[in-house]
């Protein structure tokens, strides 16, 4: 990674990384991990750094000051080695509330799974409302729910095309996100050039959904 990035001026790209909280064995290794990440990337700072995967499994460890995770990462931000500090949430709204009550005033963004299926199914609506109350911008992962929203049952696709004949089915998921002012960043996994070109075409226009849609 470092060799690839070294070809470009540091200010010409954004670089994000995360503390791997999915493994509880990492909780006492924040300094070791962070320094190794910087070294691997060959940079002096990260533009964005996340407390990764805040969920039921690790919330107690994240909140345990004995591990020193928050204190260390906040200190790195104060030194300019992290430009923006945030977190990704994979658990319930209640878990997010616990994390925010402890660290919310220092969080600059939050990444959640958000799409029109999980709006109700995983209470993404409630999570967006919670982040809005804290004034924290929303980053989106799984906008197409692993590709499941890129193609629908024929009858459902027909309903969408009746409303927007020129709109790709997958684009509806992105138009839904464009309807939410809290959303500032959308992360979309793309496996080929065609998908990249379609996403670029979709986001070249701002066409949020109307009420009836």
Positions of predicted regions on the chain:
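Metal-dependent catalytic neighborhoods of phosphoester/phosphodiester hydrolases
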Residues: 1-3, 27-28, 59
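Acidic (Asp/Glu)-rich catalytic clusters
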Residues: 2-12, 35-44, 77, 99-105, ...
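A short, structured active-site edge motif that brings together acidic residues
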Residues: 11-23, 49-51, 112
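Generic anion/oxyanion-binding catalytic loop in active/binding sites
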Residues: 19, 35-38, 161-162, 185
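Glycine-rich anion/phosphate-binding loops
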Residues: 24-35
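Active-site groove signature of glycoside hydrolases
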Residues: 39-61
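Beta/alpha (TIM)-barrel catalytic core signal, keyed to glycine-rich beta->alpha loops juxtaposed to Asp/Glu
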Residues: 54-213
């Amino acid at each position: 990674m470092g060799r690839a990035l070294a070809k470009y001026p540091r200010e010409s790209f954004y670089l994000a990384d995360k503390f791997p909280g999915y493994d509880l064995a990492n909780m006492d290794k924040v300094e070791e991990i962070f320094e190794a990440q910087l070294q691997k990337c060959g940079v002096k700072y990260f533009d964005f750094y996340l407390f990764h995967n805040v969920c039921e499994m690790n919330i107690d460890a994240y909140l345990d000051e004995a591990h020193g995770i928050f204190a260390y990462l906040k200190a790195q931000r104060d030194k300019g080695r992290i430009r923006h500090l945030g977190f990704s949430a994979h658990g319930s709204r209640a878990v997010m509330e616990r994390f925010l009550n402890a660290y919310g005033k220092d969080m600059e963004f939050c990444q959640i799974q958000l799409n029109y299926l999980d709006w109700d199914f995983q209470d993404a609506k409630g999570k967006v409302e919670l982040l809005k109350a804290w004034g924290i911008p929303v980053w989106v992962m799984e906008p197409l729910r692993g590709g499941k929203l890129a193609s629908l049952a024929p009858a459902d696709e027909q309903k969408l095309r009746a409303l927007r004949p020129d709109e790709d089915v997958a684009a509806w998921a992105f138009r839904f996100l464009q309807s939410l002012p809290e959303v500032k960043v959308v992360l979309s996994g793309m496996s080929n050039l065609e998908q990249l070109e379609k996403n670029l075409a979709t986001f070249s226009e701002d066409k949020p959904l109307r009420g009836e849609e």
